[in-house]
Amino acid sequence: MSASAVRRFVAWGSVIGRALWGLIAALVFLALGGLYGGIAMLSDPSGAALGMDTVLPLLPVADFRLPGVFLVVVMGFAPLLSAFGLAVRPRWAWTAAVERLSGRSWAWTAALALGLVLSVWLAVQGTLIGFRWPIQYVTALNAALILALALAPGVRHACRRRVRG
């Protein structure tokens, strides 16, 4: 790793560092759950493998394929990309527009957006099928943690937009 890449890391021992690495951990946890649930839904679109076949009639979909794709892409791969961006801070041309608009790192913006999307996903889930499984409560706590850590002043400061040179 180059010296400039090392300088982009926030020290673990600092309060900001612990909050930032906590955000990264919460995103990885979200990704693991999204990949697990999404792959299970795609493997068995009836939902029986997850014990969710009884709620399928309550949903506006014929099977769990579409929710499975959503979970894999939005709640699986996207949080991994955001966590990578927060940890490594790559400078990619395609992320410059997001950084200009938000004034923060694209990865921070993605983490905040994922926390909001997860909150909406859980609200819709709660409306349609209720909160029946413990993992829904764990996921709700994770959504709150992602939002709280992303909005923490130190994390926001650490993720401020860097001038590209």
Predicted regions and their residues:
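Topology signature of small-to-medium multi-pass alpha-helical membrane proteins
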Residues: S2-G165
